[in-house]
Amino acid sequence: MSYSLRIADLPEDERPREKLLKYGAKHLGNAELIAILLATGQGKGKLSAVGLGQYILQQLGQNRQDPMDVLRNIHPQELIAFPGIGPAKATTILAAVELGKRVFQSRPLEKMVVDSPEAAAIALSQDLMWQTQEHFAIVMLDVKNRLLATKVITIGTATETLIHPREIFREVIKQGATRLIVAHNHPSGGLEPSPEDIRLTEFLLQGAQYLQIPVLDHLILGHGKHQSLRQCTDLWERFPQGD
């Protein structure tokens, strides 16, 4: 596809809007999705809307960055700096990005059963998934793993958060929960548990054994992904929770 060719001059099955209607949004590339938001390119003889979308992604992807990660938190003036992008197009893109975040984060909480890392990640996505600071939160459950409440316990720096097990179990007992899942985010998007993450989990599992309030998992969240320490470590074999 020529990125200077007007979308109106493309074969119908190559036009972003027509492709979306015929095949669904998931079949469009990122540049094509941006093109739909832009509606127009830079003008006659210059980049089409698809070409401009591709150019934006290329520029955002400099220095080996993921352009979608950059776009997730981009400032309006950064978009307006691109030739062919004015306030109207910039705000349309930013509104779409924000709407996507909210759709991802939205979930029905009442009577939600949290019986997997995926379900726990959904329950905590609004509090943890896209934060630029490190947050530590807990999911409190009843005996049937039904969600009672979620709570952010601490907000730390971008690299660490300070938490003591007693703060966690105090809140769990206060809510009348019988089991819990703990979680924190890595603002970098990396999901590898740090030595501090492992040590804190050990302390929590030991405290849970003493209080007979099982800790079902410790999740790390970031940039739309999650990691379960129960699945990637042997901590629950070393400190059984009786769950």
From Swiss-Prot:
In terms of superkingdom, the source organism counts as Bacteria
Which positions does the motif JAMM motif occupy? 184-197
Q: Which residues form a coiled coil?
A: none
MF annotations from Gene Ontology? metal ion binding; metallopeptidase activity
**Mind telling me which Gene3D superfamilies this protein's record contains?**
Cytidine Deaminase, domain 2
Q: Which residues form the MPN domain?
A: 113-235
Record's keyword terms, sorted:
Hydrolase, Metal-binding, Metalloprotease, Protease, Zinc
Matching entries from InterPro entries are given as: MPN (IPR037518), RadC_JAB (IPR025657), UPF0758 (IPR001405), UPF0758_CS (IPR020891), UPF0758_N (IPR046778)
One Pfam annotation, family name?
RadC
Q: Which family does it belong to?
A: Belongs to the UPF0758 family.
- Name of this chain's protein: UPF0758 protein sll0766
Species of provenance = Synechocystis sp. (strain ATCC 27184 / PCC 6803 / Kazusa)
